């Protein structure tokens, strides 16, 4: 019977993943900005439908983790480096006409860019407002009567403001919701355990994905770097930094622009189609780092389990626990949880795109674990996982996808954490 159930579950999960990933490259063609990876601005699919809970089950609690919303570039090095390179090239007559036009637009925006380094943008604020309101609308049974919520964030301002946007919107939906917001070293272990300010910081082993030893199968030819340099510079001789680094910085700027309202700044120096053409290779690089750091997110998973237990037994009295952090946390957490097969660790590089797509770790990306209680048996708890507000598969057996028994999930993840320690 167990073998039959396992086969059924595998079939269901495979069909789910197939529906999501059968045309991954087609998805990139349809929306080339997805190839921006973790620079992709959050985009909610308005046609998303959620499966009704099995009869007799009612949602009562949500555990959530979200990345901050759209922001300016996260540190000053990119803007300073490009300022230095472009200014030197312009002074020495090394810019093409297209490069000079871009340089002028860049300098016009320079003060704004340098002032805004790492800060949340209006778009980032609005992303979290939308996620919050849809959460309220999707699960009215949880929020209708109000209740207590704990929200914690990293010490970064963009995360604190993302938390504020989300929580303010939720309270506007129902003023009876009481939210305690906290950005503190006391709570870092549950949201950014790797932060140097975390007094409980621990060391965990790094993991290496198996595809790395077969990376050469994916090929390494990438003419885009040279194409970009030819469009901007007559020559790069004598400029600080090597050509490949300069081209890489220009691509980093390009993919960041939609988050700060400056699309078009670079003209035709780079196109979405060109970024999309190299997406699969870029995605391999992304999978390497999210896979590598998965075990460092064990404290977050332990926090999720502990707070869920407290909500279930009533000791916390909360209807929600919300966390606001970074891609460096939610990406590895996605792998640790094995969402949509992200933990499968394929040997073939060409298979990686089918179990992880780096646009899923976009600006304001989020994981929601929604808990349902049986009206007949209070200890009978189901959980549904949403990745970016879309139902997702977990690596645990179930006979009612997308719903899983909390007892099974809890046991599975506790064992996974214990195996690493």
Q: Residues of each region from the PLM?
A:
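Signature for phosphate-centric chemistry
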Residues: 20-148, 154-321, 325-421
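Bacterial Sec-dependent N-terminal signal peptides
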Residues: 1-23
